[in-house]
Design a protein with these regions (language model features):
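Non-catalytic DNA-recognition/assembly elements of restriction-modification systems
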Residues: 1-24, 151, 155-156
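A short beta-sheet element
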Residues: 39-40, 61-124
């Protein structure tokens, strides 16, 4: 199933889980209301999917569409530039959501090898972006060769190390977000004081 090399595990996305496609059979009239789905931009812009940035699509009760689950790794599948193909993100929410048609997902089932929250950082690494770049094929429009990517070998830290790394990076992210909020407050306070000077 996988091979251990010292402090690393050699595996592949095909061994870590099962892949699925995004929405299919939809027209422009189906969008705007209904069930939440993850947009291309949400995947492209965030290493963890933002749950306050869903859009909506009409889906019937008996309609067969793939559902995104907690821990799924999502990738952009198609773009006009190769740099935008294969950009990854991870869904860490619990709401039942769907995925746009220009992305695909991998449902991580082998949680003895991969810690999904850690993968949100892993797929954002510069080294991983360089690794995935050759799988973007095309001329005027580029598509990710999904089958080859799934079979390609990747190296992960041990599960224990993944959890430790995620914990450290998660705390740093929280610190950055706190600092960002404080900066916004200071800027608001500055603007208020400047306005008071000229009343």
């Amino acid at each position: 199933m996988y091979t251990q090399y010292g402090d690393e595990v050699l595996t592949s996305f095909a061994e870590l889980g099962t892949s699925y496609s995004g929405l299919s059979g939809k027209s422009a009239q189906d969008f705007g209301s209904g069930k939440p789905f993850i947009t291309y931009l949400n995947v492209y812009s965030n290493n963890v999917i933002k749950e306050n940035d869903f859009q909506y699509v009409a889906i019937k009760d008996d309609e067969k569409q793939n559902v995104v689950k907690y821990g799924d790794v999502l990738f952009t599948l198609s773009s006009e530039t190769p740099e935008e193909v294969g950009v990854g993100s991870v869904y860490l929410g619990k709401e039942k959501v769907y995925l746009n048609s220009f992305c695909f997902g991998i449902h991580i089932t082998n949680t003895e090898v991969a810690f999904p929250p850690y993968l949100s950082y892993y797929v954002s690494l510069t080294a991983f972006r360089k690794f995935i770049y050759p799988y973007a094929q095309g001329s005027t429009r580029f598509n990710l060769c999904k089958a080859d990517l799934e079979k390609a070998s990747i190296k992960l830290p041990t599960l224990a190390d993944q959890k430790r790394i995620y914990s450290v990076l998660g705390h740093i992210d929280c610190k950055i977000e706190t600092e960002r909020q404080m900066l916004n407050l200071y800027n608001s306070q500055k603007q208020y004081l400047l306005r008071q000077m000229f009343i």
